[in-house]
């Protein structure tokens, strides 16, 4: 038996779940663009830019079931629901992520087979990877942006979260705002484990193709992170952090000067 759960954040959009699902299917057919698509055996993740009334332009994330995951952990919370649940806690901690406007989950018996979560489209933001690729960006200006990114990660970790995929393309810089927006947050999880947080931070030291991170700037970022993380005063933790960063560096030797 199929059961649909739909949650919205605005009173004026109190819609029936079946109606929201119909709107989703219509929006998918006329999507503005496919931002990301991952297809594995019995597992699909898609991110689309769509337009849906009354919300306007949205970033729609679709997750379809994975048989292996269902068998291993049938009662595990879905990625979409996790984003929905975490949002208010993140907002209270001044951690910027795209604002979710609705969440829809389809279950057959007790098994989640499909999840949708829609977030507001951020039109004015630029990915860190796109900024790094600009030839006319001043080095001192880019270092300032990197410092903002490190501060955002410090706040995320001090609040007891790890992002799970801190690629440069998942850090959105919004002009005129101090906040750095974390995107693609379906790997986000709660943990205060310092080793997990060190691994999370180390991922930012693996820049994308054709981008460069000089050793002086990298060291500045490391010291800034350690200074902002009072819980990482243990020299052994600093050693582990540098080990994780060196491992990321070895995967992209040509990206470090």
Protein language model features and the residues they cover:
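Conserved short alpha-helix within the protein kinase catalytic core
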Residues: 139, 143-150
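Residue-level marker of alpha-helix boundaries and capping positions
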Residues: 77-78, 143, 212
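AlphaC helix of the protein kinase catalytic domain
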Residues: 127-137
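Catalytic-loop of the protein kinase fold
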Residues: 158-168
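Conserved ATP-binding subdomain of kinase catalytic cores across diverse folds
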Residues: 25-126, 148, 154, 158
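Juxta-kinase regulatory segment immediately upstream of eukaryotic protein kinase catalytic domains
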Residues: 1-37, 244
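C-lobe/activation-segment region of protein kinase-like
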Residues: 181-257
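Conserved protein kinase catalytic/activation segment
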Residues: 170-182
């Amino acid at each position: 038996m199929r059961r649909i759960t739909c949650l919205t954040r605005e009173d004026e959009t109190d819609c029936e779940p079946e109606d929201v699902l119909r709107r989703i299917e219509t929006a998918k057919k006329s999507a503005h663009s496919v931002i990301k698509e991952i297809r594995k055996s019995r597992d699909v993740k898609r991110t689309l830019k769509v337009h849906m009334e009354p919300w306007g332009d949205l970033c729609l994330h679709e997750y379809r079931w994975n048989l292996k995951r269902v068998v291993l952990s049938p009662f595990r919370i879905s990625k979409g629901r996790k984003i929905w649940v975490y949002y208010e806690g993140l907002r209270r901690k001044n951690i910027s992520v795209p604002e979710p406007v609705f969440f829809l989950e389809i279950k057959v018996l007790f098994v989640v087979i499909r999840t949708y979560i829609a977030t507001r489209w951020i039109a004015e933001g630029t990915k860190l990877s796109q900024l790094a690729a600009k030839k006319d960006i001043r080095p001192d200006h880019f270092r300032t942006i990197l410092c903002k990114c490190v501060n955002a990660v410090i706040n995320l970790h001090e609040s007891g979260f790890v992002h799970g995929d801190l690629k440069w393309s998942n850090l959105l810089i919004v002009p005129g705002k101090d906040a750095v927006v974390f995107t693609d947050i379906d790997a986000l999880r709660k943990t205060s484990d310092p080793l997990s947080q060190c691994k999370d931070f180390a991922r930012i030291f693996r820049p994308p193709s054709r981008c460069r991170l000089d050793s002086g700037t990298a060291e500045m970022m490391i010291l800034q992170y350690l200074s902002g993380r009072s819980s990482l005063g243990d020299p052994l933790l600093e050693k582990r952090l540098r080990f994780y960063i060196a491992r990321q560096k070895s995967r992209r030797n040509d990206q470090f000067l």
